[in-house]
UniProtKB/Swiss-Prot annotation:
The lineage of its organism: Bacteria, Bacillati, Bacillota, Clostridia, Eubacteriales. This is Chaperone protein DnaJ. Zn(2+) 2 binds at C167, C170, C193, C196. It holds the Pfam family DnaJ_C. GO terms for molecular function: ATP binding; heat shock protein binding; unfolded protein binding; zinc ion binding.
Length: 374
């Protein structure tokens, strides 16, 4: 790259700081990396220029020589060096390059071995409750099938009396290092060991119960305590009742999803209960004592005289128990006044007398369409 301005290649002004040089290189190296621009010769050449410029400007002696004489004058007059030492000096650049190469660069973050402790998977179970069960609480038994550690081998996967052996290919690390030659030099990457599958151990004599897996499917009956006050959409967590962990890892959790069947009479909103009650016109007018159903049983309630249809009365503390404490909600009673559709002679006569006593009968005779057109 004779007669080219290294600062210009990296998009910098002469005299740029080490930090500015490093940041510029990171940005351009990712943009023009060959694995990100396969088949693009122009990008490949640009990447070579970027690396050559960085090798000069990142080295204090070469940079000083270049700034003074316009040439780095280092052995070979160019080249790209050996990158087998990894990208440790570039912070997280090695992690970014991992996505290009599909493996870990030496000096970068290491992969987790498959024989490391792993938390078990969480599970979900939906349970249906009656209105009463949700309101008062209940204990239910459910049947689930989950993955558990094999009792025969203790979860090792090896036949009883034996144990897994360290993989002779990866030395128990679960990964192997592979050197790749690129236009930039040699890159060392890590990949999962193909002999042990990344576990770091090999089972020569597998357990006859789990066939080397270390875990088996088991059916279990679990008792679930449903607290009073739950409603549709609530979820109850059962810690540690999910699938067992692997390699000594903790078990997952079991989440119980609640669905409540609607009641024929009561309607629930939050922790309050709503109910409609029907009374006759005379009772609404004169007032009456009546029996109102609640979740605790029937209670006596006095409907005051002159109650209009649609009036709502509150029965304090007759609602649902709050799950996390704080007392109970209320029950609201909506009064619906029924108008009779069929009257016998006695009822009709009584209503006429009521109308006359109310001063409505005479007014009614003089009203209507005939009077309107007179």
């Amino acid at each position: 790259m004779a007669n080219k301005d290294y600062y210009e290649v990296l998009g910098l002004e002469k005299g740029a700081s080490d930090d500015e040089i490093k940041k510029a290189f990171r940005k351009l190296a990712i943009k023009y990396h060959p694995d990100k621009n396969r088949g693009n010769k122009e990008a490949e050449e640009k990447f070579k220029e970027i690396n050559e410029a960085y090798q000069v400007l990142s080295d204090p002696d070469k940079k000083a020589n270049y700034d003074r004489f316009g040439t780095a004058d280092f052995n070979g007059g160019g080249g790209f060096g050996d990158f087998s030492g990894g990208f440790g000096d570039f912070g997280d650049l090695g992690d970014i390059f991992n996505s290009f190469f599909g493996g870990g660069f030496s000096g970068g973050s290491s992969r987790a071995r498959k024989d490391a402790p792993q938390r078990g998977n969480d599970m979900e179970y939906s349970i249906s409750l009656t209105f009463e069960e949700a309101v008062f609480g209940v204990e239910k038994s459910i049947n689930i099938t989950r993955s558990e550690n094999c009792e025969t081998c203790g979860g090792t996967g090896a036949k009883k009396g034996t144990s897994p052996k360290t993989c002779d290919k990866c030395g128990g690390t679960g990964t192997i290092r592979v050197q790749r030659n690129t236009p930039l030099g040699s890159f060392v990457t890590q990949s999962s060991c193909d002999k042990c599958g990344g576990r770091g151990t090999i089972i020569s004599d597998p357990c006859h119960e789990c066939h080397g897996a270390g875990h088996v499917r088991k059916k279990r009956k679990i008792s679930v305590k449903i607290p009073a006050g739950v409603d549709t959409g609530n979820v109850i967590p059962l810690r540690g009742q999910g699938e067992h962990g692997k390699n000594g890892g903790p078990a997952g959790d079991l989440y119980i999803s609640i669905k409540v069947t609607p009641h024929k009479k009561f309607k629930r909103e939050g922790f309050d209960i709503y109910i409609d009650t029907h009374i006759s016109f005379p009772k609404a007018a004169l007032g009456t004592d009546m029996t109102v159903p609640t979740i605790d049983g029937d209670v006596k309630y006095t409907i005051p005289a002159g109650t209009q249809s649609g009036t709502v009365f509150r029965l304090k503390g007759k609602g649902v128990q709050r799950v996390n404490g704080g007392g109970r909600g209320n029950q609201y009673v909506k009064v619906i006044v029924d108008t009779p559709k069929a009257l016998n002679d006695k009822q009709r006569e009584a209503l006429k007398m009521f109308m006359e006593a109310s001063g409505e009968a005479k007014s009614e005779k003089k009203s209507g369409f005939k009077r309107f057109f007179e």
